């Protein structure tokens, strides 16, 4: 074997060589083959084909030329690849079912929607379409840069002027190395309207752009289901758009029906679609179809007829066809294009911005080119004017000169002319000396001066240049714009977000002591008289009971604040709806709580982005904090810190406020403090709070609520033994934050410690929940109004071992409630049809943890009435005693 010269051997590490070679190949595919330029929307092969057509003068007014000649010219001059790839690209640009606005006018067989290939290039002919001229317009006016071709013997454009936004209008598709692009076509009128809107308002949002650009407009028409996928694609550059065939159900006599498909989704092979339908019928996966035929023709367009059996439901069959065949499919949007030579994922606005900047550059460069030409011509005309003014001397000078060079030098010296002006005079024909020609030169010169002034104004003022771009785009829109083909159907299944699939209704979300959660319709609980026994709201496990309850809409957010000061978020519909007797699902199946973490408060919120609403926090040791609600708008699955506090403290309650309310904090031993929210400076999400109330020994905070400073609301107090009362908020004077508070109830063995303190207007209903899962619904107006020192009246009869665990209030919007007598006599669990809306949530804090007990009546109604009357009398006595000692009590703050 002969030895190779050492100078020709270059030793390389194979790993490095493979890496560099693959990167070179990848970049070549990305930049020079597979991805379109964001400015003209063309890949190199398409750009070279169109430029080749332009160079051959194959305009729409010229005869067609053989495709083989076009392909050969493009391959030899600009695209040194296989002729088949060039021809296939040209064929696609000629197909009116592939391009929304075809760029090649083909004559002959250029394929079909059934997947039929085009005839060989030796049989077909082609030329440019009229709209293609707009892609190439002004290309010879230095509007774009030219680069060397593959062998350096020719020049080709790096990008076309593209006087309309072709990237969005005709879309693009390509597979590169490690990335791919798939951009849907759009309506020319809509896209140009979007560019015009952007030019007038650079800060326009994508939602505002979508008022102009409704969505993709496919050449095969069809339907697009909803705008959610479109909006996602326009905002992020990626998304999935649901496309559906246009199908009608027609009567065909004898009670029979047929399904007629007249439009199919973009890029769907019609023949394969029909084969798929036939296959499903053959395999008996779809029943009821008796005949299937393709009646498509040039006269009728697409027409696929599906005959339906007489006893079959055509609508059901059509829905099955949508589900199981390409009659309905999706278009995966991936808007990747070359931006400054680099692949980039762009959204709708970015695509329009890059195009608009390209057009400004094209118009600016064209204006500079025209200005240069105009100044050159004006310069020549100035010389001719001088010559005409001194024609006799000019002729004498020329006659006396021996050579052209001497004549030119003499003219330059004597009349102060430039070389170009002198040459123009020497080249001037004698007929230009006539009076008519003199007038033409003068008129042309004056017109040129005006034209130069206009061009200079365009270059001097960006707004004038931008207006010129707008005018030219508007002209193209008027010439080539057409009606939208694809219909966007709103309200379809695919247009709906998750929450849109679920009816918006008022619900109750309950959370048990052992952290089992569920939701129920709020109408499950019927309204009853005070002192009723309630209905079973859930079946609890051993030593478990309902600890918290909120009323809200299925579409609202529910925030879960834990004893550790963390916050989690769910939508109302994300909580499983179960039966009234069901225990629910473990809360850890819905949110990721830590082992020793429990829910302190649930709050329903409609708008988490609100800058006008605040959250007020209260801890067991009397610490309070106020934070903007918007701080909690983005909460991930793992939750976020809502408040920091000491290790021996825990979060008790959180309330939603407007920022101008009074804060009410109540304790288990019946102390309550009222102070203005304005004394709480808004803090960050993770900040610790400040002292809200000074606690006496052994006391803890059990309730937090808010009230308007001018309101006529009342403070509702509920005790663990089922007693409650209403006291006007005005009886609680405004004091400084951090005080000990004043007495809000008399605590006895009969009524027990406080479990809930909240504000009411008297128009609400009250839901009281026991540790046994029993829920009763009361009209707040039926609860007696007492002074601060009163013990309250019985709200609910409790069985042995039962106590009140939580309380919530709801507003009534319908007075059509069940009759009170019927409610007392009813032994079923049927509910009243009452529509309600969330007003507030008042989760209590259970002090005991005893197990469940059977509901038993331990007192007769007559004895209960006597006890209540006697207790009301004792309450009034206690009020008189309390009022005498108020000053001494208040001085302890």
Curated annotation (Swiss-Prot):
Keyword Transferase: no
Location of the Topo IIA-type catalytic domain: 35-501
Cited PROSITE patterns: TOPO_IIA
Pfam assignment, any one: DNA_gyraseA_C
Alphabetical list of InterPro entries matching this protein: GyrA, GyrA/parC_rep, Gyrase/topoIV_suA_C, Topo_IIA-like_dom_sf, Topo_IIA_A/C_ab, Topo_IIA_A_a_sf, Topo_IIA_dom_A, Type_II_DNA_Topoisomerases
Superkingdom, natural source: Bacteria
Compartments (UniProt record): Cytoplasm
Location of the motif GyrA-box: 528-534
Chief location: cytoplasm
Biased composition (Basic and acidic residues): 863-879
GO molecular function: ATP binding; DNA binding; DNA negative supercoiling activity
EC number: 5.6.2.2
Record note on quaternary structure: Heterotetramer, composed of two GyrA and two GyrB chains. In the heterotetramer, GyrA contains the active site tyrosine that forms a transient covalent intermediate with DNA, while GyrB binds cofactors and catalyzes ATP hydrolysis.
NCBIfam families with a match to the protein in the record: gyrA, PRK05560.1, PRK05561.1
Record family assignment: Belongs to the type II topoisomerase GyrA/ParC subunit family.
Purpose: A type II topoisomerase that negatively supercoils closed circular double-stranded (ds) DNA in an ATP-dependent manner to modulate DNA topology and maintain chromosomes in an underwound state. Negative supercoiling favors strand separation, and DNA replication, transcription, recombination and repair, all of which involve strand separation. Also able to catalyze the interconversion of other topological isomers of dsDNA rings, including catenanes and knotted rings. Type II topoisomerases break and join 2 DNA strands simultaneously in an ATP-dependent manner.
Record-given protein name: DNA gyrase subunit A
Taxonomic lineage of the native organism: Bacteria, Bacillati, Bacillota, Bacilli, Bacillales
């Amino acid at each position: 074997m002969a030895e190779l010269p050492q100078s020709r051997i270059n030793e390389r590490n194979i790993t490095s060589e493979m890496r560099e070679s693959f990167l070179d190949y990848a970049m070549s595919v990305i930049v020079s083959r597979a991805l379109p330029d964001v400015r003209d929307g063309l890949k190199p092969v398409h750009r070279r084909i169109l430029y080749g057509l332009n160079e051959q003068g194959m305009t729409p007014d010229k005869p067609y030329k053989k495709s083989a000649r076009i392909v050969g010219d493009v391959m030899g001059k600009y695209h040194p690849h296989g002729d088949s790839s060039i021809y296939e690209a040209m064929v696609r640009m000629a197909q009116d079912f592939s391009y929304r606005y075809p760029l090649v006018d083909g004559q002959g067989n250029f394929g079909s929607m059934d997947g039929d290939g085009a005839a060989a290039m030796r049989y077909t002919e082609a030329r440019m379409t009229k709209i293609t001229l707009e892609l190439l317009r002004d290309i010879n006016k230095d509007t774009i840069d030219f680069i060397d071709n593959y062998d350096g013997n020719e020049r080709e454009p790096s990008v076309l002027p593209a006087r309309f936004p072709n990237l969005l209008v005709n879309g693009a598709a390509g597979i590169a190395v490690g990335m791919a692009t798939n951009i849907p076509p759009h309506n020319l009128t809509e896209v140009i309207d979007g560019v015009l809107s952007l030019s007038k308002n650079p800060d326009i949002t994508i939602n505002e752009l979508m008022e102009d650009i409704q969505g993709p407009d496919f050449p095969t028409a069809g339907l697009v289901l909803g705008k959610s996928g479109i909006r996602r694609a326009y905002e992020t550059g990626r998304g999935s758009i649901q496309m559906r065939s246009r199908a009608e159900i027609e009567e065909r006599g004898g009670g029979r029906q047929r399904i007629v498909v007249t439009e199919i989704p973009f890029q769907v092979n019609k023949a394969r679609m029909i084969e798929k339908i036939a296959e499903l019928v053959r395999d008996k996966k779809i029943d009821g179809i008796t005949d299937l035929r393709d009646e498509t023709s040039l006269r009728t367009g697409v027409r696929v007829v599906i005959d339906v059996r007489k006893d079959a439901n055509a609508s059901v069959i059509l829905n099955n066809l949508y589900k199981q065949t390409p009659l309905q499919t999706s278009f995966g949007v991936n808007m990747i294009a070359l931006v400054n030579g680099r692949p980039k994922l762009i959204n709708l606005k970015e695509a329009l911005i890059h195009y608009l900047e390209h057009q400004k550059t094209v118009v600016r460069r064209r204006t500079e080119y025209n200005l240069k030409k105009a100044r050159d011509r004006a310069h020549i005309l100035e010389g001719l004017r001088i010559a005409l003014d001194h024609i006799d001397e000019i002729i004498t000078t020329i006659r006396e000169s021996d050579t052209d060079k001497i004549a030119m030098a003499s003219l330059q010296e004597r009349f102060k002319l430039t070389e170009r002006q002198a040459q123009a005079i020497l080249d001037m024909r004698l007929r230009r000396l006539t009076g008519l020609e003199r007038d033409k030169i003068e008129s042309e010169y004056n017109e040129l001066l005006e034209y130069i002034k206009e061009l200079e104004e365009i270059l001097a003022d960006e707004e004038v240049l931008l207006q010129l771009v707008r005018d030219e785009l508007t002209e193209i829109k008027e010439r080539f714009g057409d009606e939208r083909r694809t219909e966007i159907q709103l309200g379809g299944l695919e247009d709906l977000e998750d929450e849109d699939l679920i009816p918006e209704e008022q619900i109750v979300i309950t959370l048990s002591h052992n952290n089992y959660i569920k939701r129920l319709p709020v109408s499950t609980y019927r309204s009853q008289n005070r002192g009723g026994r309630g209905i079973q709201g859930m079946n609890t496990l051993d030593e478990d009971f309902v600890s918290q309850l909120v009323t809200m809409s299925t579409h609202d957010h529910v925030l879960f604040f834990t004893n550790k000061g963390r916050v989690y978020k769910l939508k109302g519909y994300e909580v499983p709806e179960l039966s009234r007797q069901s225990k629910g699902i473990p809360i850890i199946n819905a949110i990721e709580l830590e082992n020793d973490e429990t829910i302190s408060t649930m709050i329903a919120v409609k708008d988490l982005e609100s800058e006008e609403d605040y959250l007020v926090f209260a801890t067991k040791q009397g610490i309070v904090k106020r934070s903007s609600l918007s701080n909690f708008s983005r909460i991930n699955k793992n939750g976020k810190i809502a408040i920091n506090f000491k290790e021996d403290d825990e979060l008790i309650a959180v309330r939603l406020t407007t920022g101008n309310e009074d804060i009410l904090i109540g304790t288990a031993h019946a102390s309550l403090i009222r102070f203005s929210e304005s004394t709480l400076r808004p803090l960050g999400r993770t900040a610790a709070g400040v002292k809200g109330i000074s606690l006496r020994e052994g006391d803890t905070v059990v309730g937090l609520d808010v009230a308007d400073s001018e309101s006529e609301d009342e403070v509702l107090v509920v005790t663990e033994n089922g007693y409650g009362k209403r006291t006007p908020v005005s009886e609680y004077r405004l004091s400084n934050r951090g005080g000990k508070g004043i007495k809000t109830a008399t605590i006895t063995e009969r009524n027990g410690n406080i479990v809930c303190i909240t504000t009411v207007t008297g128009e609400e209903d009250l839901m009281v929940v026991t540790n046994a899962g029993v829920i009763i619904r009361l009209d707040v107006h039926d609860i007696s109004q007492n002074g601060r020192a009163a013990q309250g009246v019985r709200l609910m009869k409790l069985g042995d071992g039962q106590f009140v665990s939580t309380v919530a209030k709801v507003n009534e919007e319908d007075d059509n409630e069940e009759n009170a007598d019927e409610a007392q006599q009813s032994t079923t669990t049927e509910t009243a049809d009452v529509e309600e809306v969330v007003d507030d949530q008042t989760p209590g804090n259970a002090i005991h943890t005893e197990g469940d007990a059977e509901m038993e009546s331990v007192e007769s109604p007559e004895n209960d009435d006597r006890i209540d009357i006697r207790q009301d009398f004792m309450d009034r006595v206690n009020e008189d005693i309390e009022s005498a000692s108020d000053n001494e009590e208040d001085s302890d703050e």
